[in-house]
Amino acid sequence: MKISTIFKYIFIVFAIGIIIYGGYKIYKNNNQEEEQENDSQTVAQEEIIQDIRLAVTNYDTINPILTNNKEILNIDTLIFEPLFTFSSDYILTPCLAKECSKTGDNTYVIKVNNSVNWQDGTSFMSKDVAFTIDVIKQSNSIYKYNVEHITNVEVVDASTLKLTLDGNVPFFEYNLTFPILSSNYYLGEDFFTSSKTPIGTGRYKISSINSNSITLSKNENWRNPEAEEIKLDNIKINLYTSMGEAFNSFKIGNVDVLNTTNTNFGEYIGTIGFNKVEYAGREFDFLALNCNDVILKDKAVRQALGYAIDKDTIVSSVYNNQKFVSQYPLDYGNYLYTSENVSSGYNAEQAKKVLEDGGWTYRNGHWKKEIDGSYRTLRLNIAVNKDQERRVQASEKIKEQLKDIGIEVTINKITNDQYSKYISNKDYQILYTGVYNSFTPDLTYYFSSGNIENYYNEEMQELINNSAIIKDSKQQKEIFQKIYTLYKEDVPFIGICRNKNITITSQSLYGNIEPSNYTTYNKAELWYRK
């Protein structure tokens, strides 16, 4: 055998050996990586804690119709469900209802989802809705406003009911967001004195109630098998006598989620070791401008006021940044008001220019204009409830800001009785006032006939009427944008600020925390602890 042939065989054997060894190393490495991945997944699974701890102060009852506790109402959204619910940006979506049709000026027909079961296994039916409306009407429930216009409820069949109203109610469907309770569950007993633990149709059910806590557990029979896998198995609601006690419990790690309107919460829990989400509430403060007033009927004056008032300074100096700057009734996160619109609008020089363009002349320290054959000096009066100290201070700040551009302002501090009469009679020039915005996007209070500012614009009236009729979301957004654009042109009122809500969470809590005024617990079933 030739030497070259021997070397060739040796080389082949050597090459095969290298290939076999390489394959072995790859196999071994893959096995090690797979074992490590399995180990890490096991560890990660072990680290996930599938329960959270909440806090409630001044507990009264878990019954959603009878409770007056705001946080209980918040938590009850996990247990009980309405006909319609809200997304985190306040889009109305079906829940227990399949559809709602307006069949006449004052009548609605609702189809309910009969595939839903109560947490005791019985079927949800339209008679449960009728029962709930009836007990709300008999009670002093916080939901009484939702049903006050319903004059008759007819159960057509197990999946259909017909509601008759006392008149035309814009956006009535938005009132159908109250929790529904089972009629059979309370059959033969007094709902208002029942000692039964309420049942719902939601993702969680009440497992136990004692003097110190309430425990919720996952509803294994919840109707939507296609929903994302629920990570959260149990929720413990700790009951406290005061917010100070709840803050302290959060601080030492016994509470994972705490809702508060107290912007000074850092005094109780410190400034580190937690996460927070601040979001705009529904308490809207604004200046109502009487559009029938001889001065304020001039649109240029109203526009100038909108530019001349520095809301950022008011919120920082008067409210110590405990509120959000606000300019519009829907700027609490409603999808019909886009974030691009958000601006305090302050521009003192533009305010002066608007007055000049509107025919006002500044001389001898005053703005003057001929109106109805007489020369008028631009002097304004702001009426404010004297018991509302912060509003009085804000009015004084506005007075200073308007003085800087040559507008004289007098502050009229009025009593509660005077304030009520001013509202009823619209007997004011400018009124510093406020409202609690509902979840409905209805803007009739500000723009329709009989509104608080004596404002009338035929185009606006048509837009407001159409806004309640159009159901297509794209068209609806277009209409609300036109309403906002016209508002900016006419300025019948000037938004100042709105309250600030805060959700505080422990750093061990994971998941998307997206609180809204409807509920803190949007997609809470996907939360977990580590």
What do these predicted ranges mean?
Residues 56-76, 96-97, 122, 172-181, ...:
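A structural "hinge/loop" feature
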Residues 98-140, 162, 295:
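Aromatic- and charge-enriched surface segment that lines or borders ligand/interaction sites
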